[in-house]
């Protein structure tokens, strides 16, 4: 009975912490910019995937986000940033760490990378702080 009660309290604490996490203003603004950029790809038939990934980048640092991609699809990974972080680079790696060739876009506080995998599997999107700035970023991606 004690173990059941402890387990129930543990699950309650985990669910409460997930519910209590609220997006910061910086995350909301970065996501707005990322969605604005992804919307441009929607004009070409890309559908924006549910979900997003936000975080903080330190100067000359990077964040890795794991994604599952499917052969035959095309993808755009769109990133929005919030000042003082102004310039980021978006790149893609396969599960062995090999950098993939992507079509790149960069304009002010937004950047994107386009990719069409030959093989289905797990890939890693890298969001890199290019300059001596830190701040919040948000990644969304589109597919068709």
What are these regions (language model features)?
Residues 1-9:
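Bacterial N-terminal signal peptides that target proteins for export
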Residues 2-3, 20-22:
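N-terminal targeting/docking segments
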Residues 21-46:
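Predominantly extracellular/luminal regions of secreted and cell-surface proteins
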Residues 23-25, 52-136, 142-144:
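Acidic, Ser/Thr/Pro-rich low-complexity intrinsically disordered segments
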Residues 41-57:
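Glycine-rich phosphate-binding "P-loop"
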């Amino acid at each position: 009975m004690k173990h059941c009660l402890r387990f129930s309290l543990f699950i309650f604490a985990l669910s409460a912490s997930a519910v209590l996490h609220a997006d910061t203003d910086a995350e909301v603004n970065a996501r707005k910019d990322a969605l604005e950029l992804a919307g441009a790809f929607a004009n070409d038939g890309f559908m924006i995937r549910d979900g997003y990934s936000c975080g903080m980048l330190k100067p000359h640092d990077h964040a890795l986000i794991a994604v599952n991609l499917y052969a035959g699809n095309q993808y755009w990974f769109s990133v929005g940033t919030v000042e003082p972080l102004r310039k980021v680079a978006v790149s893609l790696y396969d599960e062995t760490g090999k950098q993939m060739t992507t079509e790149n876009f960069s304009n002010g506080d937004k950047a994107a990378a386009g990719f069409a995998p030959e093989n289905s599997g797990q890939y890693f999107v890298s969001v890199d702080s290019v300059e001596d700035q830190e701040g919040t970023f948000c990644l969304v991606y589109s597919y068709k």
